[in-house]
From Swiss-Prot:
Keywords: DNA-binding, Nucleus, Phosphoprotein, Transcription, Transcription regulation, Transferase. Residues 381-397 have a biased composition (Low complexity). Residues 242-257, 368-378 have a biased composition (Basic residues). Gene3D superfamilies: Winged helix-like DNA-binding domain superfamily/Winged helix DNA-binding domain. This is General transcription factor IIF subunit 1. It comes from Xenopus laevis. Pfam families: TFIIF_alpha (PF05793).
Length: 524
């Protein structure tokens, strides 16, 4: 120890010895501070080289001579590598990473990768102090960075790619389902808003709902047939035709609704009345028909099918013949009734009941308000009372001349109507069927209350009648029901359906589908 200079600073000198030919090579192990490596806890440590990459650098061993050898194989392989610029790397054991296991299998595992280029521009030395106080300096040959190895299994490159694709698939599915939920929520909100608006505008929503809930009695279920789909398709097609005609009216209606919404605050009582009129006019086009046109009964109303429009002239002639036969049967008992009229006043009750059927045509033509004559006891009844209680059209012995004139007028009207029916085409004749039925006197006239009492019936729903229709041409159940209407048969709609079902079961006709409709027919 020596003091140099006058400044009074103390300087300590050490002797450092560097070996010329070191027998050992020293390497540096660098750990990351974040790993918190504590060497004092290491009881056991083992290091070995990781030679797993040896297969990558290993060449295929081919025999140089003998079987399987190739002439100048090495030279050709080298020329190929030079041509494509392929540089082979030699497998050096010193360059392979270290595997460090601490405290056996239960401990941690580290992997040390060699850091290249450390000794190119700088030199690192390791100093060790000897017993005499001098230091020996050994140069560092290699530098290794050690990182802890994860215990859990990691994915390879291919497995990672598959998992990435699966992740994208899951995320896409999640986004699609989220969009669907949002759309459903928006759709529900829109429906709620539309429902509230319909209830505000004169209860239109309720009316439309009722219209959709209303279903006509399904005839096919009772008849055990399979033509329900055809009927539904017909109804849908006809309902589609109706809005096509009303397209301009709907456009104008939307404009009116918009204007009404804009001026809701300044609305008066008259605005709602206008809306109701629009709705009523749009509800059904039948209200806009000509006032002079005769409307059929409820059973006859409804859309006319294609089969009804395409009825042949033979069918119309057959119906005409049936009507004439019925009229002749009605007119046959007239001479017997005339003999009964010549009897005394005691038989007024029988006269009124029997002659009421004969004079039904004349009474239906000239009198609107008519009631069926109530029966009275023979003892207490008198001429005046029976005449007063009977219908205005019932003849009595005193009114023989008037009844004959009424019959003549009725017969003339029937003949004139027959001439017009024969001249009119088949399509018009179907619509005008209601007129001749009332004038022929086969059904009692309807009073003002709207209730009609069914008579004996023009057409009887029998097996022979159904057989005749089915042998003529194939017909659907709708067509058969239109042939046997309640007005003609005198039966209710349920009774006609049940009777027709039983008749079809007995006949067991052949079936065929034409234009998605089940048709029944019988072979002669």
């Amino acid at each position: 120890m020596a003091s140099l200079g006058t400044s009074g600073q103390s300087v300590t000198e050490y002797v450092v010895r560097v070996p010329r030919n070191p027998s050992k090579r020293y390497s540096l192990m660098a750990f990351n501070a974040a790993d918190k490596v504590d060497f004092s806890t290491w009881n056991q440590a083992r290091m070995e080289r990781d030679l797993s990459a040896k297969k990558m650098y290993q060449e295929e061993e081919m025999p140089e001579s003998g079987a399987g050898s190739e002439y100048n194989r090495k030279q050709r392989e080298e020329s190929r590598r030079k041509k494509y610029g392929i540089i082979l790397r030699e497998f050096k054991v010193d360059d392979q990473p270290w595997i460090l296991r601490v405290n056996g299998k239960a401990g941690r595992k580290y992997k040390g990768v060699k850091k290249g280029g450390v000794t190119e521009n700088a030199s690192y030395f390791i100093f060790t102090q000897c017993a005499d106080g001098a230091f020996e300096a050994f140069p560092v040959s290699n530098w290794y960075n050690f990182t802890p190895v994860a215990k859990h299994r990691t994915l390879t490159a291919e497995e990672a790619e598959q998992e990435w694709e699966r992740r994208n698939k899951v995320l896409n599915h999640f986004t699609i389902m989220q969009q669907r939920r949002l759309k459903d929520q928006v759709g529900d909100e829109d429906e709620d808003e539309e429902g509230g608006g319909k209830l505000e505008k004169g209860g239109k929503g309720k009316k439309k709902k009722k219209k959709s809930d209303l279903k006509i009695h399904d005839l096919e279920d009772d008849l055990e047939l399979s033509s329900t789909e055809s009927e539904n398709s017909d109804e849908e097609g006809e309902s589609r035709k109706k809005p096509q005609k009303k397209v301009p009216a709907k456009g104008g209606k939307k404009k009116k609704r918009k204007s009404d919404d804009e001026a809701l605050e300044d609305s008066d009582d008259g605005d709602f009345e206008g809306q109701e009129v629009d709705y009523m006019s749009d509800e059904s086009s039948s209200d806009e028909e000509l006032p002079g046109k005769i409307k059929p009964a409820k059973e006859e109303e409804g859309p006319k099918g294609l089969d009804e429009q395409s009825e042949s002239s033979e069918e119309s002639e057959e119906e005409k013949a049936e009507e004439e036969e019925g009229e002749e049967e009605k007119k046959a008992p007239t001479p017997q009734d005339n003999k009964k009229k010549k009897k005394g006043d005691s038989s007024d009750e029988s006269e009124t009941s029997e002659d009421s059927d004969i004079d039904g045509a004349s009474s239906s033509l000239f009198m609107q308000k008519k009631k069926t004559p109530p029966k009275k006891d023979k003892k207490g009844g008198s001429n005046s009372s029976s005449r007063g209680n009977s219908r205005p059209g019932t003849p009595s012995p005193d009114t023989g001349n008037t009844s004959s004139t009424l019959r003549a007028a009725a017969s003339k009207l029937e003949q004139s109507k027959r001439g017009t029916v024969s001249n009119t085409p088949a399509a018009k004749r179907l619509k005008m069927e209601a007129g001749p039925q009332n004038t022929s006197g086969k059904s009692t006239p309807q009073p003002q209350s709207g209730k009609s009492t069914p008579s004996s019936g023009d057409i009887q729903l029998t097996e022979e009648a159904v057989r005749r229709y089915l042998t003529r041409k194939p017909m659907t159940t709708k067509d058969l029901l239109k042939k046997f209407q309640t007005k003609k048969t005198g039966l209710s709609s349920e009774q006609t359906v049940n009777v027709l079902a039983q008749i079809l079961k007995r006949l067991n006709p052949d079936r065929k589908v034409v234009h998605d409709k089940m048709h029944f027919y019988l072979k002669e």
